[in-house]
Curated annotation (Swiss-Prot):
Cellular component terms per the entry's GO annotation: cytoplasm
Principal place of residence: cytoplasm
CDD domains xrefs: LipB
Record's subcellular location: Cytoplasm
Pathway: Protein modification; protein lipoylation via endogenous pathway; protein N(6)-(lipoyl)lysine from octanoyl-[acyl-carrier-protein]: step 1/2
EC number: 2.3.1.181
Name of the molecule in the record: Octanoyltransferase
HAMAP family per record: LipB (MF_00013)
Species whose genome carries this gene: Corynebacterium aurimucosum (strain ATCC 700975 / DSM 44827 / CIP 107346 / CN-1) (Corynebacterium nigricans)
Taxonomy, superkingdom: Bacteria
Record-annotated BPL/LPL catalytic domain positions: 49-237
Positions bound to substrate: R87, G88, G89, R90, I91, T92, W93, H94, A167, L168, G169, G180, L181, A182
Family to which this protein belongs: Belongs to the LipB family.
Site (Lowers pKa of active site Cys): K164
Length: 268
């Protein structure tokens, strides 16, 4: 269920266990495994109480990461490396031109993982709307941030179906979060063509640049995203219902109509 639901505590309350300022570390371009090892090190220190909350901002070289629910049919056919990870979800791609943010924070008690995910989504929605994608929102039953098929992208090369702009994948251990969110900025969509991204085969993926018809760099997207994320975690930005219904896949609809026509012809 992706639509907001009543959280375990008031929506205007911080979801963090600490009110100390967050540390933001900009890692530049870093290999996925190295960044994952760094996350694990920080998360262990945070759980032990020897480290405060940290947000890592990073860009990865091209790589696929497979979450715990990845299926064999999701896997790539282009030979690019796949790293099995301990987050939720299925397979996705990370790479050049994609802004990746890993909040490593201690969640307030009682831990509400769903509320945490919704706050991450809300931050992405707020940021991409501020950048100009005014119809960005949620699809019920699917995580992440989407643009509906009823919205035409400024770049005609953009996909036409419902399309995902921001992806989420998290892990919470001992009340401390790992992994996080990825926002497509200037990246190519080529690598998504070789996988079933997030296990979804009836929708597409897009970028801020395609949606707005101009180059939207990671540097441009970073400031509004981090600002919205800090507000969402603190409770200043509350989760709202930006949910829209998933549009039927036109190819599947056409195939079903053809199947029904063949069946009707055979019955005559």
């Amino acid at each position: 269920m992706t639509a907001p639901r009543e959280p375990f505590f008031p929506v205007d309350r911080s979801i963090r266990a600490s009110d100390e300022p967050l540390e933001i570390r900009r890692l530049g371009r870093m290999g996925y495994q190295e960044a994952w090892d760094l996350q694990a090190e920080i998360a262990a220190a945070r759980a032990a109480g020897t480290q405060g909350d940290v947000i890592l901002v990073v860009e990865h070289p091209n790589v696929y990461t497979a979450g715990k629910r990845t299926q064999p049919e999701d896997m790539p056919d282009n030979g690019l490396p796949v790293i099995d990870v301990d987050r939720g979800g299925r397979i996705t791609w990370h790479g050049e031109g994609q802004l990746v943010v890993y909040p490593i924070i201690k969640l307030a008690e009682p831990v509400d993982v769903v509320d945490y995910v919704r706050r991450l989504e809300e931050a992405i929605i707020q940021a991409v709307r501020e950048l100009g994608v005014s119809t960005a929102g949620r699809i019920d039953g699917r995580s992440g941030v989407w643009v509906p098929s009823t919205t035409q992208a400024a770049d005609p090369a953009a996909p036409k179906r419902d399309r995902k702009l921001g992806a989420l994948g998290i892990r919470v251990t001992r009340g401390v979060t790992m992994h996080g969110l990825a926002l497509n900025c200037t990246n190519t969509l080529e690598y998504y063509e070789h996988i079933v991204a997030c296990g979804i085969d009836d929708a597409d993926v897009s970028t801020l640049s395609l949606e707005l018809g101009r180059e939207v760099t990671m540097e441009e997207a970073e400031a509004p995203l981090l600002d919205a994320l800090l507000k969402a975690l603190s409770g200043e930005l509350t989760v709202a219902d930006h949910t829209f219904a998933s549009a039927p896949d036109p190819i599947k609809v056409a195939n079903e109509k053809a199947r029904q026509a063949r069946k009707a012809a055979q019955e005559k």
